[in-house]
Every structure is written in structure tokens, then in C-alpha cells.
């Protein structure tokens, strides 16, 4: 059974769309339909305190993402107003440090890459493209590019593959789209071009999110995806350079699923959907994902009524 340690009154004026802790778990960023991004300090005892309210978007803010702390205090936000904004903490004060408005429709998600890849982030958009922002340390400027025609009818999420200590390690990320596909993208370093390495069709409706597990297990990579069809799908690959991705249906929920997220250690998974409930999953020692029992059986009851 899981318990709620602390409720945080964010005082958002409308629906909250995302909440992300930084790597240390002592800062929480939230965003919502009120066009605001908020940052809170989270104490070890569970108490929280508001730090700053950031305004700069002209529409609902869908996603926020923290950069690795080696780059200082950096937070990115994605909004319906077609903008990606990067916020920076300077001498204890947060300010807008970069604004990117190249997407032609709502920016549906944003994600900073692992620090091993350098200071870079990816954004997805309803215009069907994926944006890449990379900070050039020599010029001290952000460099941008867009990958065209990534998903028909729009891209809903992006998530990076875990970083590696090997300098020759390849950069990859996964995307989910309204074309019912999950796609793996690979960077050709020589050409500086992103190409679709693999397109996987395991959903019957829009794929709302695909999340790449932030850690590998003996070289094995894992991805989960969820969609409006209620399917929660696990993808695994033993050797990402030579093997093929294998998929497994973890659950067919009686409702649409919108979000799936791994814990930082990669051993827990949270899933949420149309039933306003959060389901937690845990990977056992045999590598199997098991749903953690809960006292509230509403989802199971809904499944029986279907």
C-alpha cells in the first residue's frame, strides 16, 4: 500500500499539467493551464515552500524539464503558445534566459538530455516535428534544428535514452505520436542528422507518451508507452546496436492512459489515465513488471464492467 507523505497546495489557478522533481528531489517545478510555471523547495521532512512563480507563456504550459545540476539551475517549459522557454537561476533569482518559437503548433513536451550528451534538449509538437536545442560552449549560444515529418497528426512526447560514460556512445531518444507509432531516433554525429532508427506499431490509437528507462540493466534498454487505447506496452532490447526490440503488453486498462514515467533508479513505473488514478508498477528480481496492489479497486471494477 502506498501513502501520501505530503500534499502541496500549488495555488495554480487552473488545471496542473505536469510536476517534476529535480535530481536531488529538493526542488519541484509545476505548470498548468494558468500559463504559469512554479518552483517549490521540498524539505526532507516533506514540507514545501513556494520559491518563484514564472510567467512568460501565452497559453497553457504542458511540460517542464530540469537540466542536470552540473549546468546550474536550468528549467525548460513547453506550451500551447508554440514556445519553449529556458529559465535560469542566477544568484538565487530565476529569469528567462532563452525563448524558442519555431514550432508551428502547440509544443507538447520538452526533455533535457542526460548530461553525458552535453547541454541539449528535445521538444515535440503538434505540428509533427521534433526540435533539438544544443548549447554551444564556445559561442555561448543555443543552436536549434528541427526534425521534419516525425509523426503524422502530431508528436506527443519525447524521452532520451540513458547517457553513457563511453565518449563513442550514440545519442538516441524515443517519441510517441498520433499516428499510433513509437519511434526510436538516432543521431548521426558526422552528418549531425537525426534519423528514425525504428518505428514500432503496438497501439490502436494515439500514443500519448513513451518513456525511456533512465538506467540499463546489463546493457538491456527498456521503454514503456501508453495510449488512448488503454494499452501499456513494454519494449526491451538486449543489445541496442545489434538486437531487435521486443514488445510485451503489460496491461490493457479500461480507460485511456496519458502518462507513464520511470523512477530515477528505473525499478518503479507510474502510470496515469482517464480514471484519475495513478498505478504503480515494480520490477522484480526476475525482470518482470508487477503492479503494486492497492486498496482502491476502482480500476479493476471498471474493467469488470466493460
Swiss-Prot record:
Keyword Transport in record: yes
Keywords, comma-separated and alphabetical: Cytoplasmic vesicle, Endoplasmic reticulum, ER-Golgi transport, Lysosome, Membrane, mRNA transport, Nuclear pore complex, Nucleus, Protein transport, Repeat, Translocation, Transport, WD repeat
SUPFAM superfamilies the record matches: WD40 repeat-like (SSF50978)
MF GO annotations: structural molecule activity
InterPro entries per the UniProt record, alphabetical: Sec13/Seh1_fam (IPR037363), WD40/YVTN_repeat-like_dom_sf (IPR015943), WD40_repeat_dom_sf (IPR036322), WD40_rpt (IPR001680)
Gene3D superfamilies: YVTN repeat-like/Quinoprotein amine dehydrogenase (2.130.10.10)
Claim: Transit peptide is one of the keywords in the record: no
Disulfide partners: none
The WD repeat ranges on this chain: 11-50, 56-97, 102-143, 150-195, 202-245, 252-291
Listed Pfam families: WD40
A GO cellular component entry from the record: COPII vesicle coat
Intracellular or extracellular location(s): Cytoplasmic vesicle, COPII-coated vesicle membrane; Endoplasmic reticulum membrane; Nucleus, Nuclear pore complex; Lysosome membrane
Membrane topology: Peripheral membrane protein
Protein family membership: Belongs to the WD repeat SEC13 family.
Role played: Functions as a component of the nuclear pore complex (NPC) and the COPII coat.
Subunit structure: Probably part of the GATOR complex.
Name under which the protein is recorded: Protein SEC13 homolog
Species assigned in the record: Caenorhabditis briggsae
Gene that encodes the chain: npp-20
Amino acid at each position: 500500500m502506498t501513502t501520501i507523505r505530503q500534499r502541496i497546495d500549488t495555488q495554480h489557478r487552473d488545471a496542473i499539467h505536469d510536476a517534476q522533481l529535480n535530481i536531488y528531489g529538493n526542488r519541484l517545478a509545476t505548470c498548468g493551464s494558468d500559463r504559469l510555471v512554479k518552483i517549490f523547495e521540498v524539505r526532507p521532512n516533506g514540507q514545501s515552500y513556494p520559491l518563484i512563480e514564472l510567467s512568460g507563456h501565452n497559453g497553457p504550459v504542458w511540460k517542464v524539464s530540469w537540466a542536470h545540476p552540473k549546468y546550474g539551475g536550468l528549467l525548460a517549459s513547453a506550451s500551447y503558445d508554440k514556445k519553449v522557454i529556458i529559465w535560469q537561476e542566477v544568484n538565487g533569482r530565476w529569469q528567462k534566459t532563452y525563448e524558442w518559437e519555431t514550432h508551428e503548433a502547440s509544443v507538447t513536451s520538452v526533455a533535457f538530455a542526460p548530461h553525458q550528451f552535453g547541454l541539449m534538449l528535445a521538444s515535440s509538437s503538434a505540428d509533427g516535428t521534433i526540435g533539438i536545442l544544443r548549447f554551444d560552449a564556445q559561442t555561448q549560444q543555443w543552436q536549434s534544428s528541427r526534425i521534419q515529418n516525425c509523426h503524422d497528426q502530431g508528436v506527443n512526447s519525447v524521452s532520451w535514452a540513458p547517457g553513457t560514460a563511453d565518449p563513442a556512445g550514440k545519442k538516441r531518444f524515443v517519441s510517441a505520436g498520433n499516428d499510433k507509432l513509437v519511434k526510436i531516433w538516432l543521431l548521426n554525429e558526422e552528418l549531425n542528422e537525426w534519423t528514425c532508427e525504428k518505428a514500432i506499431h503496438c497501439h490502436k490509437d494515439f500514443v500519448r507518451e513513451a518513456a525511456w528507462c533512465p538506467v540499463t540493466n546489463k546493457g538491456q534498454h527498456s521503454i514503456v508507452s501508453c495510449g488512448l487505447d488503454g494499452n501499456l506496452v513494454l519494449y526491451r532490447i538486449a543489445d541496442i546496436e545489434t538486437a531487435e526490440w521486443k514488445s510485451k503488453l503489460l496491461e490493457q486498462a479500461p480507460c485511456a492512459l496519458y502518462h507513464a514515467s520511470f523512477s530515477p533508479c528505473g525499478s518503479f513505473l507510474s502510470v496515469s489515465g482517464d480514471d484519475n488514478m495513478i498505478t504503480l508498477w515494480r520490477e522484480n528480481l526476475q525482470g518482470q513488471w508487477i503492479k503494486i496492489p492497492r486498496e482502491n479497486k476502482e480500476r479493476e471494477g471498471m474493467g469488470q464492467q466493460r
